[in-house]
């Protein structure tokens, strides 16, 4: 629960859930529904994660890149800002913001190896050209706070920092970036929700520890339910649904 989060641009940009689930008019004209909108962002989050594994950047860079991508689509339509190019550009920008710089040409090289049919038309100049547009869409606010630091501190404080709990909670936090939680909730509260889910799964009673935090558990449990709902809905995601969503943007997969 870093003290300077509350004075940060990240805190000031937190949104209400209904502000996040808004399809822009240009996208609506293409028939994009709210489910399509979420599905495309989910798909691009996976692309960023997979590409990051190949270029070997820290998880924080991945999380920042996905946050940038999701912030862009609060203000810009997918018709205006092509999702694949935005995803690539956000990873490039995040690597610089997090001081773990990746060469743009390496991004182009690896993404074409991973997804040759989807990214064959993109070159170095496209990423560099989109970079300024993304920066403008972000209002040049590049600072992002993540749940990871709070997660480690909470696990240690609750005496839950064994290897298994670390792996489970870290994995859940990673999965939250396939959703818009980071745009809506303070990162420390997302961390608490992930610990809550893991503690129930592992049958660890940490009720007293949560009570000592004097945190609103209704808020924590609501986030936990959002995560669990995502896991349930994740099972129904098919390649056919992804293709259908992208086809409405006239983006051939």
Curated annotation (Swiss-Prot):
Family: Belongs to the cyclin family. Cyclin C subfamily.
SUPFAM superfamilies, sorted: Cyclin-like (SSF47954)
Keyword set, alphabetical order: Cell cycle, Cell division, Cyclin
Protein name: Cyclin-C1-1
Gene3D superfamilies recorded: Cyclin-like
Gene Ontology process terms (BP): cell division; regulation of transcription by RNA polymerase II
Natural source organism: Arabidopsis thaliana (Mouse-ear cress)
CDD domains: CYCLIN_AtCycC_rpt1, CYCLIN_AtCycC_rpt2
One GO MF term attached to the UniProt entry: cyclin-dependent protein serine/threonine kinase regulator activity
InterPro entries: Cyclin-like_dom (IPR013763), Cyclin-like_sf (IPR036915), Cyclin/Ssn8 (IPR043198), Cyclin_N (IPR006671)
Superkingdom in the source lineage: Eukaryota
Pfam families recorded: Cyclin_N (PF00134)
């Amino acid at each position: 629960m870093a003290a300077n989060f509350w004075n940060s641009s990240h805190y000031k940009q937190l949104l209400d859930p209904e502000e996040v689930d808004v399809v822009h008019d240009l996208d609506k004209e293409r028939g994009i529904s709210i489910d399509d909108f979420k599905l495309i962002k989910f798909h691009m989050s996976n692309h960023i994660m997979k590409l990051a594994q190949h270029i070997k950047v820290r998880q924080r860079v991945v999380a920042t890149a996905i946050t940038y991508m999701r912030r862009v689509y609060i203000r810009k339509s997918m018709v205006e800002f092509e999702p694949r190019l935005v995803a690539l550009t956000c990873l490039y920008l995040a690597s610089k913001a997090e001081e773990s710089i990746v060469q743009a040409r390496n991004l182009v090289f690896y993404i074409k190896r991973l997804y040759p049919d989807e990214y064959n038309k993109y070159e170095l100049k496209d990423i560099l050209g989109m970079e300024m547009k993304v920066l403008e869409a972000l209002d040049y606010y590049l600072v992002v706070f993540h749940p990871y630091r709070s997660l480690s501190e909470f696990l240690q404080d609750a005496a839950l920092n064994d290897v298994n709990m670390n792996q489970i909670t870290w994995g859940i936090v990673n999965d939250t970036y396939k959703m818009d939680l980071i745009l809506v909730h303070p990162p420390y509260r997302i961390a608490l929700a992930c610990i809550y889910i893991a503690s129930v799964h592992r049958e660890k009673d940490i009720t007293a520890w949560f009570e000592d935090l004097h945190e609103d558990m209704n808020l924590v449990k609501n986030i936990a339910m959002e995560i669990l709902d995502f896991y349930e809905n994740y099972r129904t995601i098919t390649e056919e649904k992804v293709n259908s969503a992208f086809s409405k943007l006239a983006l051939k997969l």
